[in-house]
Amino acid sequence: MIRLHDTMAREKRPFVPLNPQRITMYVCGPTVYGRAHIGNARPAVVFDTLARLIRHEFGEQSLIYARNVTDVDDKIIASAETEGVDPSVITERYERHYLEDMGALGVRPPDIAPHATQEIGAMTAMIEQLVASGNAYEAEGHVLFSVPSDADYGVLSKRDRDQMIAGARVEVAPYKRDPADFVLWKPSAEEVIGWDSPWGRGRPGWHVECSAMIARHLGETIDIHGGGLDLIFPHHENEIAQSRCAHGGLPLARFWVHNGFVDMGAEKMSKSLGNVITPAELLEQGHRGETLRLALLSAHYRQPLPWTENLVSQAKSTLDRLYRAAGEADPTAVDDGVIEALRDDLNTPLALSRLSALDGGALKASAHLLGLLGSSSADWFQGDTDAAAVEARIAERAEAKKNRDFAAADRIRDELKADGIVLEDGAGGTTWRRE
């Protein structure tokens, strides 16, 4: 049985879905105004791995996995104004980049990818419900959620009132009845993207987007809601409040699962801090997506992950070792030890250590569950390389050695090494692989 750490309960609990034939999981996806950094990739990889585990345990068709795209946001609007283009140019560009980058890391597309701009009707309908129930109010063209109207507010983050106000993203506006109240709808100037609504032309607040899309595509109560630790407050806390009030007190999610940060030095990797490195940059440097995926899985998902060159180098060495051990075997059965590790709150470090004890088909099948060893060993060691050209240089080197021109032989070896090709001399001749 799968056991997951539930942020709400502050403990690991057995995962028993509401309906094993229709398991629902929603993960907060990208706000598409810039290139994703490797910290943004961590939840994509973590929840992709959890989705693989759920499908292994309950059946390939058992899970409906939704990951949204926030394509209306103040940062998107600012980027569009800077470039002098329509916001859709920004969002389409960076969504395309996001999907390319995550695909390179072996992240499968979600079953549903709702876009905020395509769900405005669902959002305004939810806001109208909250106004009608007395949980929201209109003020100066805005609609705000009344935090004091929800007696259970704070159940996820366990923050006291002063912490809530300090942790909110915005300064206290004069039109708020209470400093903790948050925006459901905000007015848009004529030149800014917006939609007609009962409260005038405007656009949705960040939090109501996810609540409305979850209800529309997955239902009022889902099995798992995921995201990064930084989303616990205010985003997920606010989602819980508005969904509960709109749906007669029903819980939004039965499990809240949050991944830890990727750190650069002593700080969390963050665009606002400017200490980011992107998958695109790492791929351009010659690292393979599978290497980056293994690096992201090397620490338990709830723990911080310090990102270093050594981490990536170790991940590459581990994959070299695993590909050699797997050979060209076809996948067989997944190893029980790997399964048990993943069932225990997605313990990927333990699962990876178990992989090191396997070989052949069992290794291949078990690694697939982690999204690893998706290539053949030949492709891993020699793929994307002009094999004929390398073999020609090896033949040239062999001829030089035959003629006892060892300086020429060493030069060829060094030139290939500089191109990332490692030669290995053995009794059966010379073989090669990429570094």
Feature-to-residue mapping (PLM):
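Short, well-structured beta-strand/strand-turn elements
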Residues: Q61-I64, G134-E140, V422-E424
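The substrate-binding groove and active-site-proximal loops of carbohydrate-active enzymes
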Residues: E81-P87, I112-T117, G228
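Structural preference for alpha-helix termini/caps and helix-kink/transition segments
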Residues: K268-E435
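Alpha-helical recognition segments enriched in aromatics with Gly/Pro capping
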Residues: M1-Y33, A44, D48, E57, ...
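N-terminal, positively charged nucleic-acid-binding surface of large information/translation enzymes
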Residues: A9, L18-G106, W432
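Short, glycine/charge-rich beta-strand/loop segments that flank catalytic centers
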Residues: V69-V72, E95-Y98, R108-M123, G141-D150
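Short Gly/Ser/Thr- and Asp/Glu-enriched loop/turn motifs at secondary-structure junctions
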Residues: P20, P109, A139-E140, D425-G429
